[in-house]
A protein has these predicted regions:
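Short glycine-rich substrate-engagement loop in P-loop NTPases that contacts/grips substrate
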Residues: 1-14
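Conserved phosphate/pyrophosphate-binding and hydrolysis machinery centered on Walker-type P-loop NTPases
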Residues: 2-3, 36-39, 135, 242-246
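Short, conserved clusters of charged catalytic residues that mark active-site
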Residues: 8-11, 45, 126-127, 219
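Glycine-rich phosphate-binding loop signature in dinucleotide/nucleotide-binding domains
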Residues: 18-22
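The catalytic "switch" region of P-loop NTPases
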Residues: 23-25, 33-134, 148, 152-182
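Winged-helix-like regulatory helical subdomains adjacent to P-loop NTPase cores
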Residues: 106, 113-232, 236, 247, ...
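Short, cationic-aromatic polyanion-contact patches
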Residues: 238-258
Length: 259
């Protein structure tokens, strides 16, 4: 859509909220997937709709932007030349950037039980442990490895006792797929590289961690905060240190930054 069309849609959403009489939240999944020019056009329309909003012409209560690009990276592109806040509230405010946490080990086990019920694919205990150790519950990595297992296994055999189709992937198969991901130009890992591309301070911090240095967690540190919000870093189990989110990211970043 053109920018005027996007603005018309935003104003329409405001009318919907007004008629509902309830707060309306708009969630845009993969908001950064379209060409950058289109993404910027849509987000500028949100700015315009917000600037026009009042009691008689409301805008939506909130907009959730879900994607790989940290929304702070778009700020300069959204602000026209000379658009400074000068102490007042900016029209482009991100109330809270959030990196959705990965699955806990308990949640991953629960997901795999449901997966086994639906698909007949029952990972061995060692395979479940390997999946956890490799991914640390990162949802895309978990999903991708399970998908690849499905592709490799084909139609599961049927158990003579229950007549259910059953197959049991091994830890070795999980390990092989995880290593295979590093050799693919998959969009997810490329997006991990985009997070640090051209950001010298982020690269330096990651290289320190890759070198085995212990780094204390500090949300006040802008570089740490950026990498935590982007999902590349996570707090350690003790909550005292930062660490790279999972071994797959670690191996990818080592290859990327070591070149």
């Amino acid at each position: 859509p053109t920018e005027p069309q996007s603005l018309s849609f935003c104003l329409y959403l405001g009318e919907v909220q007004k008629r509902l009489g309830k707060p309306l939240v708009l969630m845009l999944d993969e908001y950064d997937a379209p060409p950058r020019k289109l993404t910027i056009s849509i987000l500028r329309s949100f700015r315009s709709a917000l600037s026009l909003a009042d009691d008689s012409r409301p805008f939506v209560h909130a907009v959730l932007l879900c994607g790989k690009t940290h929304v702070r990276d778009l700020r300069d592109e959204l602000r026209p030349t000379g658009d400074e806040t000068r102490g007042s509230g900016s029209l482009w405010n991100v109330g809270l950037p959030v990196a959705l946490p990965g699955l806990s080990q308990h949640e991953l086990d629960s997901l795999l039980r449901d997966y086994a019920t639906d698909s007949g694919v029952v990972l061995t205990r060692e395979a479940r442990d390997e999946l956890w150790q490799r991914t640390r519950g990162q949802p895309w990595l978990v999903s991708r490895i399970l998908y690849q297992l499905d592709e490799q296994l084909g139609s599961p055999r049927r158990s003579p006792e229950t007549n259910l189709a059953v197959s049991s992937p091994t830890a070795q198969q999980v390990r092989a797929i995880a290593e295979q991901l590093l050799g693919e130009d998959c969009v997810h890992l490329l997006s991990v590289g985009d997070v640090v591309n051209g950001r010298k301070e982020a690269e330096e911090l990651l290289l320190r961690l890759l070198g085995g240095e212990e780094v204390a967690l500090s949300r006040a540190d802008e570089v740490q905060s950026y990498l935590l919000d982007s999902g590349l870093l996570t707090a350690s189990d003790t909550g005292q240190r930062v660490e790279i989110s999972n071994p797959i990211y670690e191996a990818y970043l080592l290859r990327l930054l070591g070149d």
